[in-house]
């Protein structure tokens, strides 16, 4: 919470240092963080939060700092921020960041096409998460899910049932 207020006040360097020294993983803090930011948004300078998050996507070497920034960007309308969307799509190709990026990309107008492109390129947990988010809206996607959806570097069983459900395998 203090870090968000530091960012809100424009104390970016101080916030970055504090973020780099945190001893937890963002996956466990995502929901409480976002709920708190939404609840306290009147006290938070969202423009500063957005500026900090976007800049860290390109400059931070700390995985959890990048995840923090991706979490923050989930609640900011980025449709017109083409450069930022491109950064998010690049980060999505790393299994480490795919889930966080999907939470941003799902808010775009062409979200399913973006998710489909990512799903085709990632192979580990990124593929598993992408399959969860991907909607089988046309034959091209359904065919890909049938032929490739289960292929991942983790465990095919993690996506098998989801793939079967999405393409309505029982009906085929």
Regions found by a protein language model. Name each.
Residues 1-10, 124-129, 133-172:
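Long, helix-rich interaction regions
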Residues 52-54, 85-89, 114-119, 144-146:
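Buried hydrophobic core positions in alpha-solenoid tandem helical repeats
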Residues 68, 87, 100-103, 129, ...:
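Alpha-solenoid helical repeat scaffolds
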Residues 81, 100, 113-114, 157:
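Short linear functional motifs in flexible/disordered or boundary regions
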Residues 1-79, 83, 91-94, 98, ...:
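Extended repeat-based scaffolds of very large eukaryotic assembly and lipid-transport proteins
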Residues 102-104, 118, 125, 157:
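A generic structural motif
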Residues 39, 59, 71-78, 90, ...:
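Positions within ordered alpha-helical repeat solenoids
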Residues 109-127:
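Short linear, low-complexity motifs centered on an aromatic residue
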């Amino acid at each position: 919470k203090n870090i968000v207020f530091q960012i809100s006040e424009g104390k970016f360097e101080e916030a970055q240092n504090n973020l780099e020294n945190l001893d937890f993983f963002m996956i466990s803090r995502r929901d409480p963080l976002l709920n708190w930011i939404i609840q306290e948004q009147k006290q938070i300078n969202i423009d500063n939060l957005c500026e900090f998050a976007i800049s860290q996507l390109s400059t931070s070497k700390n995985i959890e700092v990048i995840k923090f920034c991706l979490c923050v960007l989930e609640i900011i309308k980025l449709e017109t921020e083409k450069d930022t969307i491109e950064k998010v799509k690049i980060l999505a190709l790393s299994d480490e960041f795919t889930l966080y990026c999907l939470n941003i990309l799902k808010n775009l107008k062409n979200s399913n096409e973006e998710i489909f492109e990512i799903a085709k390129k990632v192979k580990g947990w990124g593929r598993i998460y992408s399959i969860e988010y991907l909607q089988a809206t046309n034959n091209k996607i359904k065919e890909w899910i049938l032929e490739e959806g289960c292929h991942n570097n983790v465990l095919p069983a993690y996506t098998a049932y989801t793939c079967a459900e999405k393409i309505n395998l029982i009906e085929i």
